[in-house]
């Protein structure tokens, strides 16, 4: 369930924003490690158990919910406290838009909790690494990309672009999973066509800056 993770992601963002005095990121974007961190915290459930649409829409639309998240989160910052009522409001907000969280559920004839279901999948988040390719930092070293979606300040291993693509191709051809993070707000991304493009001229221009 994507939205099971998204709910925990927003809770983590709210906490981060509070301790940053309102200077955190309460937007909808994040990176792959956000999923891993939430998975380790709360586990996971199947999509059929928690589809995350508890409002009148066929598709996910968090525009209204995010406005309320910002209002509640920034109110706590201004008041410099998070009261018991604050936590109730936050959880009620997510229950209203995403649905109530399941404590237990039955899947394919077996009963699970979110944590026990995660354990049954045999996934170790420590087995996954994050790679990136930026020209303003040294290659073959880790650094924390300075982008808003990296609000958790996680580090990634920086590779030349061609080598990063070689690693991705090798992983896929040998049966491993690759999760690709991209900026869907860029002009080259098309939801309609399901593709993302970067012009060769644009790419080389950035490499020579």
Predicted regions and their residues:
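Structured alpha-helical subdomains that flank or immediately precede key functional sites
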Residues: 1-200
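Conserved small/polar residues in nucleotide/adenosyl-binding loops
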Residues: 201-208
């Amino acid at each position: 369930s994507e939205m099971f993770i998204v709910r925990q992601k927003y809770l983590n963002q709210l906490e981060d924003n509070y301790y940053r005095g309102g200077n955190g990121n309460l937007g909808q974007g994040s990176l792959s490690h956000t999923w891993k961190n939430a998975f380790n915290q709360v586990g996971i459930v199947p999509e059929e158990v928690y589809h995350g649409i508890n409002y009148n829409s066929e598709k996910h639309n968090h525009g209204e919910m995010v406005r309320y998240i910002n209002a509640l989160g920034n109110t706590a910052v201004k008041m410099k406290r998070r009261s018991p009522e604050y936590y109730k409001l936050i959880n009620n907000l997510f229950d209203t838009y995403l649905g109530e969280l399941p404590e237990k559920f039955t899947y394919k004839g077996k009963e699970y909790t979110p944590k026990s279901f995660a354990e049954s999948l045999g996934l170790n988040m420590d087995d996954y690494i994050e790679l990136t390719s930026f020209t303003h930092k040294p290659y073959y070293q880790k650094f924390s990309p300075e982008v808003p979606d990296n609000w958790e300040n996680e580090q990634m291993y920086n590779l030349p672009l061609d080598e990063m693509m070689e690693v991705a191709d090798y992983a896929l051809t040998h049966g491993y999973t690759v999760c690709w993070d991209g900026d869907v707000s860029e002009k080259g991304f098309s939801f309609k066509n399901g593709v993302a493009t970067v012009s060769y001229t644009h790419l080389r221009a950035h490499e020579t800056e």
